[in-house]
């Protein structure tokens, strides 16, 4: 499996109401995107799920979490309460293609699907 060691992100977070919680939301979104990129896969065999439990269905844990460098750009949203914006969703959406692009750049392999499995990148 691919080991992601560092992810850097910059995000417009509106007005930060709680910096620690905001960073936690960014890190959580990154973990979800990481899972989608290299871990989470439903395996079916003749229509039957072969990995129906968390024992078999891989999810990222704290041990899989990369170092996160996060820059929070504060541009308050005038129409939102206290100027806040959603924080956890954007990294989840952007991290998956960023990891796929990094693997493609490192290997030169066409990677038409996620999650990217070891057999997809073995040379």
Where are these regions (language model features)?
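C-terminal catalytic domains of large/alpha subunits in multi-subunit enzymes
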Residues: 1-123
């Amino acid at each position: 499996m691919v080991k992601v060691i560092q992810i850097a992100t910059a995000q417009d977070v509106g007005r930060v109401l709680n910096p620690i919680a905001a960073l936690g939301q960014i890190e959580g979104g990154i973990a979800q995107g990481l899972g989608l990129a290299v871990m989470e896969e439903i395996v079916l065999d003749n229509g039957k799920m072969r990995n129906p439990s968390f024992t078999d269905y891989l999810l990222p844990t704290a041990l899989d979490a990369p170092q996160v460098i996060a820059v929070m750009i504060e541009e308050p949203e005038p129409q939102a309460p206290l100027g806040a914006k959603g924080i956890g969703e954007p990294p989840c959406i952007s991290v998956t293609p960023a990891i796929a692009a990094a693997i493609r750049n490192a290997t030169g392999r066409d990677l038409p699907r996620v999650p990217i499995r070891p057999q997809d990148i073995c040379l």
